[in-house]
């Protein structure tokens, strides 16, 4: 017995729905949330694909499990013929002519008004989800090739911050500091650790030394911003529209003005379909009117996605500008590190007051006031752009307190490596303080005794 394409539909529809669900679930699970990103990155590579997957499942349920199209045929036609016409019109595309216009006799004019996107909406959404994840994949591959263990540092910092015992937490910070310093040494061509990977070799150039990770991170942010803009262009092409950039404004304006879809043509519900039937060696052409029920859902989905993409574009662009400024403007990096230095100094001063209540505690004068270039050297030559970037990432995920302890240890490491210059400026500081106090003998707390890292 001859079977129409629609008669084999249930099994095929179940397989297609299972394919879409499995593909979306596997894709999302492969991009798990990690610590080497921020909230804006997660909105792009994790939550947006999740939203697109949900939209894909909703549309697929209607498209493959429901009735996406219904066509009005001759009441005397057999049921098999009705199913055939609906299957044909679904596959072959339909076209929209406003009710107040006459249907053109020219078939070429009809083809120019064809609507051919509704069958491909689930695939379009999956492709968009993949595109949103590409910058994340690029970042993870390149950061791994750079040889820097960012994820390990952030995970260790989060675990260390969760420790309640002070001694255990201090040991954890010391271990993180050692790992951090090793990563910093890797930024120099003369580092103790041999670089592996093509990115690690490229970054040893004079220009990229200590900035490779920051450049990769900023470029990834740029990719996120460019991707959101590209989504509007892709939807313009898929929907055969030149104004999807303003689609949301148009829909809201139509709703406000009370204009129905029959006038605007946005995701039309009623369309026309031409098909040919060979009967007794003659080719007969017919036109039927069809109801695209799937377009009711498509309109709501794309209106929501337009609003989401617009919000995401603004947030992602602001995030890109923020990270560019913080990664490459020297004063921003110095101010950021100085903030933690001041917090650590204040903490040490309060501890000294607490344990020496009967003693006269002088203000802890730092060498930075007498040699500000040391702080610049600490940021530009020791931490470099990549070190400051890693501090920011650790702060975003583990909190500021562990970064305070980490900066204190890093400053101590910097002092040990530049002890001659520090001793010279310590002597200059003592002379200056005696001059300020009129030659009186001023006792300045020894950094080693007061545990001050400055």
Curated annotation (Swiss-Prot):
Q: What are the entry keywords? A: Cell junction, Cell membrane, Developmental protein, Differentiation, Gap junction, Ion channel, Ion transport, Membrane, Neurogenesis, Transmembrane, Transmembrane helix, Transport
- Coiled-coil residues are none
Q: Does the keyword Membrane apply?
A: yes
Pfam families per the UniProt record, alphabetical: Innexin
Top-rank taxon, per record: Eukaryota
Q: Which residues lie on this side of the membrane: Cytoplasmic?
A: 1-48, 140-214, 322-454
Give ranges for the Extracellular compartment.
Answer: 70-118, 236-300
Bilayer topology annotation: Multi-pass membrane protein
The free-text tissue note of the record is: Specifically expressed in sensory neurons and interneurons in the head and tail. Expressed in neurons AWC, ASH, AFD, ASI, ADL, ASK, BAG, AWB, and ADF (head sensory neurons); ADA, AIZ, RIC, AIY, and AIM (head interneurons); PHA and PHB (tail sensory neurons); and PVC and PVQ (tail interneurons).
Kindly list the places in or outside the cell where this protein is found, as annotated in its UniProt entry. Answer: Cell membrane; Cell junction, Gap junction
Gene Ontology molecular-function annotations: calcium channel inhibitor activity; gap junction channel activity; gap junction hemi-channel activity; protein kinase inhibitor activity
| Principal subcellular localization | membrane
What cellular component GO annotations does this protein have?
gap junction; neuronal cell body membrane; plasma membrane
Q: Which GO terms describe its biological process?
A: cell differentiation; determination of left/right asymmetry in nervous system; intercellular transport; monoatomic ion transmembrane transport
Q: Which residues cross the membrane?
A: 49-69, 119-139, 215-235, 301-321
The keyword Transport appears for this protein = yes
Recorded family membership: Belongs to the pannexin family.
Q: What does this protein do?
A: Structural component of the gap junctions that specifically coordinates left-right asymmetry in the developing nervous system. Acts by forming gap junction network linking embryonic neurons and providing electrical coupling between cells, leading to promote or inhibit AWC signaling. Required for the left and right AWC olfactory neurons to establish asymmetric patterns of gene expression during embryogenesis. Acts autonomously.
Protein name, UniProt field: Innexin-19
Organism of origin is: Caenorhabditis elegans
